[in-house]
């Protein structure tokens, strides 16, 4: 079944551990405009089976949140999308992660190009030990040859998209370390989008931030989905409810339920999901 043949309402594709109503081991049903399709994905840390037969379609131009208790596999799943595990030979993924018809798990895929297409922002702000300007320009220089004027425009564009330009435009030559925690995280988001990825992965982007900075990041996430497909891992269920269009609940390496965020939080199909959402578990 290809996307052209799918006429299913994404709001109805929300039950079963395998996601979208598919039984474990079966090919998942894809909503219209799926940006990433995960098919029978298993992940191992040595002999530990961390992800078990994950089937999931990430809708394009939407914010998808992964929730679940610590150790459930949500960050592991996120990091398979851009092969962050590739440096560790004891870690391996089996199955398929398909974007634009290409299996991202193929070993011959260029990792640098993959990570240009799928950007990532980590839990703690990680500015480079260089100026604010160079933090943005660094990644761009790896993939594009721009004139100084073009680079200036790109830096301003990225910082503006990250809602940071007005705060730093007069101190671009200063170190990124001089920014507040919230500003540093927005700098990292600007750095991620400067190379114009198709997908942006956010792994607990607000966990180290104060409430005001968290609010700014959440507003930014809502704006970014007009240009990117965004996937966020969060322990904060209120944040998932506020920011995301779709939510996946995971437990012990399995995808328990996936669907529209409003339905997941108001009327989940699975009792396990309801127990977690209401605080009776996890």
From Swiss-Prot:
Q: How does it sit in the membrane?
A: Peripheral membrane protein
Where is the ABC transporter domain positioned along the sequence? 36-277
Q: Does the keyword Nucleotide-binding apply?
A: yes
Residues given in the record as ATP binding sites = 68-75
Which cysteine pairs are joined by S-S bonds?
Answer: none
For this UniProt entry, what is the primary localization, expressed as one broad class? membrane
Which EC number applies? 7.3.2.1
Q: Does the keyword Nucleotide-binding apply?
A: yes
A single Gene Ontology MF term assigned here is: ATP binding
State the UniProt keywords alphabetically: ATP-binding, Cell inner membrane, Cell membrane, Membrane, Nucleotide-binding, Phosphate transport, Translocase, Transport
Q: What class of enzyme is it?
A: translocase
Known catalytic reactions: phosphate(out) + ATP + H2O = ADP + 2 phosphate(in) + H(+)
List this protein's GO terms for biological process. phosphate ion transmembrane transport
InterPro entries, alphabetized: AAA+_ATPase, ABC_transporter-like_ATP-bd, ABC_transporter-like_CS, P-loop_NTPase, PstB-like
List the GO terms this entry assigns under cellular component, sorted alphabetically: plasma membrane
Q: Which Pfam families match?
A: ABC_tran
The entry's localization annotation reads: Cell inner membrane
Q: Briefly state the protein's biological role.
A: Part of the ABC transporter complex PstSACB involved in phosphate import. Responsible for energy coupling to the transport system.
**Assembly and interaction partners:** The complex is composed of two ATP-binding proteins (PstB), two transmembrane proteins (PstC and PstA) and a solute-binding protein (PstS).
Q: Which family does it belong to?
A: Belongs to the ABC transporter superfamily. Phosphate importer (TC 3.A.1.7) family.
Please report the name of this protein according to its UniProt entry.
Phosphate import ATP-binding protein PstB
């Amino acid at each position: 079944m290809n996307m052209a043949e799918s006429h299913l309402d994404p709001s109805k594709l929300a039950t079963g551990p395998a996601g979208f109503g598919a039984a474990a081991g079966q090919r998942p049903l894809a909503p219209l405009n799926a940006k990433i399709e995960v098919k029978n994905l298993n992940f191992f840390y040595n002999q530990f089976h961390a992800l078990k037969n994950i089937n999931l379609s990430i809708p394009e131009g939407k914010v998808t949140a992964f929730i679940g208790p610590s150790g459930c596999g949500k960050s592991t799943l996120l990091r398979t999308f851009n092969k962050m595990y590739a440096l560790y030979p004891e870690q391996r993924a089996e199955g398929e992660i398909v974007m634009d018809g290409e299996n991202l798990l193929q070993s011959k895929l260029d990792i640098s190009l993959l990570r240009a297409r799928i950007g990532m922002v980590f839990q703690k702000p990680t500015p480079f030990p260089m100026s604010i300007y160079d933090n943005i320009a660094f990644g761009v220089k790896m993939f594009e040859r721009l004139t100084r004027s073009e680079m200036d425009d790109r830096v301003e564009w990225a910082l503006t998209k990250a809602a940071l330009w007005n705060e730093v435009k007069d101190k671009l030559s200063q170190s990124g370390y001089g920014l507040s925690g919230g500003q540093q995280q927005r700098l990292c988001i600007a750095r991620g989008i400067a190379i114009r990825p198709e997908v942006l992965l956010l792994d607990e982007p607000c966990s180290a931030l104060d409430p005001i900075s968290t609010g700014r990041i959440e507003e930014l996430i809502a704006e970014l989905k007009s240009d990117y497909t965004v996937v966020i891992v969060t322990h904060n269920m209120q944040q998932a409810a506020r920011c995301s269009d779709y939510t996946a609940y995971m437990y012990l390496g399995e995808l328990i339920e996936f669907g529209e965020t409003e339905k997941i939080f108001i009327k989940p199909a699975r009792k396990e999901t309801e127990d977690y959402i209401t605080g009776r578990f996890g």
